[in-house]
Amino acid sequence: EGTRPGDSAADVLARCDGVACEDTRVTGKLMKHLGLSKPLWRYDDHANERDRARLVESMHDRAIALVSDAGTPLVSDPGYRLVNDCRAAGVAVTTLPGACAVVAGLTLSGLPNDRFLFGGFLPSKEKARRDVLEELGSVDATLVFYETGPRLLKSLAAVSEVLGAREVAVARELTKLHEECRRGLPDGLTAYYDANPPKGEIVLLIGPADPGDVEHDIDALLTEAMTELKASQA
C-alpha cells in the first residue's frame, strides 16, 4: 500500500498490516496510545538473514511499517539491511519524515551545517577512536557522532588531543524534557561534564577546522618531510 503526501506516522501505523520494530514492548506502548492493535515483529541488531527473508517474503502481499524506538530508522540502525533486501526482491519502499538526532543536533548547535559528515558511533577503543578522528579531521565539514554518557569524556579528550581547539557542541536528550546543548572547546566541555556527568542519548558535533589551522598543519607536515629527507641524504 502506498502512502499519500502528508501522511503521518500514525496514519501509516493505522493502515499497515503489521509493524517491524526494535522492541515490541516499546512499540506496543505506542500502539496502545494510538488505540491500534497490529501484529508486531522484533527487528533489531540481532536480526539475521533468515529473519529478514521472512519479513521480506511477507511484504509481497502485506504492508509492513518499520519503526525504531527513537529517531529515524536506518540512521545508525540495522534497518538499512532490510530495505536493501526489499529492493533486491522488488518490494516497494517509501519513507516518512520524522525525528532525527543528527539533524536536530546540527540545527541546535549553530555549527556550520551546509556540509556535514555523520560518522555513527565513535569506536569504544582508544586507538580506533583516535584513528577515526585523524581520518575524518581533514574533512572540510562539521563532524557528527552519536555518543553515550559514560564514554563522552574519553571522546572529548580524544578530540582535544587529535584535533586541537576546535569548536565542539554536545547535544543531549534532544526533543525531550531535559534537552541540552552546550558548545565550547573540548577541554572546557571536558571540565564541565567531569563535574556534571551527562545522562541520556548524546550527539557530539565537531566544527570544521579553521582554514588557518589547515595551512599550519600542511606547513608542519612539509617541514617534517624535508627534515626527514635531509636526514636520509646525510
Go through each PLM region and give its residues:
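Glycine-rich, flexible N-terminal cofactor/catalytic loop recognition
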Residues: 1-46
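Short active-site oxyanion
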Residues: 12-19, 90-94, 142-143
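Alpha-helix capping/helix-boundary segments
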Residues: 25-27, 101, 151, 210
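Conserved helicase motor
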Residues: 41-50, 122-125
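Acidic, metal-coordinating catalytic cores used for nucleic-acid/nucleotide bond scission
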Residues: 47, 70-78, 124, 152
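Glycine/small-residue-rich loop that forms an oxyanion/phosphate-binding "nest" at active or ligand-binding sites
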Residues: 52-100, 104
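A contiguous loop/helix-start segment that scaffolds small-molecule binding in enzyme catalytic cores
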Residues: 63, 142, 149-233
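Class I SAM-dependent methyltransferase SAM-binding "motif I" and its flanking Rossmann-like core
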Residues: 81-139
